């Protein structure tokens, strides 16, 4: 019999993963806001996987509550995720999913490109998602994982920040074809921030090419999500801490304040 899987936060994405795991025969136990997570850890002391599926804005608060017994089998799927984010909670070998599909309320999930997975439970996750027709690519090294996390951050932050100053409902294809200079400039500044956060240097052309791949994975994907303003605020806070100029992104903030 397959071991139990715990999902902390059953939102739209969490629901997709729950479906995937259940269809592969894994018992799934949700942990919601109203539940005491320590009590759940006492009831399920040795889960196969603890997938933290909460939104980015709730990540720190939830991670601080993850019981010690669960930290060696933790899975993370948030955007804006980097190694320092899990190392801050003494998690050394998590399973990480760079999610490249979206799920909105009342709609089926939509795949952009294959999601990237790395870590002890990568095979379990990839097999489960592929069973519901969500393709995955298993990464073989931490260097690959770091690149893929940075790429996803560049994609999400670029389209969200650009979407704040362009017409409502603009798609990624329109951004890339009609506002390419804006998209590339924002992406370059986001890469600066990612390099400061990681202490690593990246091939910028490769990241820009990866951004374009994401754009054409779903050309009708809308740029500005509900979290766009919060992402801009976080980016500016990091840039201030790092002493980075990022003039185009700062101009966007100034424009929004007019």
Model-identified regions with their sequence ranges:
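NAD(P)-dependent Rossmann-like dehydrogenase/reductase catalytic/cofactor-binding core
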Residues: 2, 184, 188-258
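Anion (oxyanion) recognition and catalysis
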Residues: 22, 130, 240
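Rossmann-fold dinucleotide-binding core
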Residues: 74-152
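Active-site-proximal catalytic alpha-helix in oxidoreductases
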Residues: 144-191
